[in-house]
């Protein structure tokens, strides 16, 4: 925050990457040593295709159309995202972000992403504030923290963001903390949301105009 206030945007990006990336990389090293680190870096340099992993995700297309798994499949394909294991796909350790998109119902445009960042901040039990910080800085202050999306300004709607934060906090599990989602993928999406305690996405309110 001090770096942002001083308009040291490069240092702010470095600090953010060190805080989030360092934690994720540390977990990969502790759990899988060099293999875990390789899995994290391979997609960044567009190498390391894992056909078995990719095939497992591609098979979600055969699930019922009302299922959690089919919704995840559609989320990837409709946005032209590569699955984990496909060339250019993100590491599986990061899939909790896309699982959150599906469960929350937030889109991948800037308005949806800042709400998804708040939803994520709610369900992440360890340092979740950093995801809210990311969303506000990336999609409201116009400081680019990730190479995946361009920066935007003016997307902080306090009502939407606080609602998203509350919805994430209501989730019974931390999707980022070794959550085994595979047994839930064949189930209806609405049932999964209910079991996890994710409140329904309220439609945007329309101001009442006096006659």
For the regions a protein language model found, what residue spans apply to each?
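Core of folded catalytic or high-affinity ligand/protein-binding domains
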Residues: 12, 35-187
């Amino acid at each position: 925050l001090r770096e942002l206030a001083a308009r040291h945007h490069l240092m702010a990006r470095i600090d953010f990457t060190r805080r989030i990336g360092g934690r994720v990389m540390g977990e990969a090293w502790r759990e899988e040593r060099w293999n875990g680190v390789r899995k994290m870096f391979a997609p960044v340099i567009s190498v390391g295709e894992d056909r078995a992993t990719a095939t497992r995700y591609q098979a979600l297309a055969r699930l019922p159309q009302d299922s959690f798994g089919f919704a995840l499949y559609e989320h990837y394909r409709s946005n032209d995202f590569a699955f984990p294991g496909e060339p250019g796909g993100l590491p599986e350790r990061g899939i909790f972000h896309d699982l959150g998109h599906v469960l929350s119902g937030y889109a991948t445009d800037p308005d949806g992403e800042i709400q998804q960042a708040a939803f994520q901040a709610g369900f992440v039990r360890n340092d979740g504030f950093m995801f809210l910080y990311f969303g506000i800085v990336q999609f409201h202050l116009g400081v680019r923290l990730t190479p995946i999306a361009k920066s935007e300004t003016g997307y902080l709607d306090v009502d939407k963001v606080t609602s998203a934060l509350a919805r994430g906090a209501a989730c019974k599990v931390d999707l980022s903390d070794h959550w085994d989602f595979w047994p839930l993928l064949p189930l209806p999406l609405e049932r999964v949301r209910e079991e996890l305690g994710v409140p329904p996405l309220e439609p945007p309110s329309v101001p009442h105009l006096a006659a």
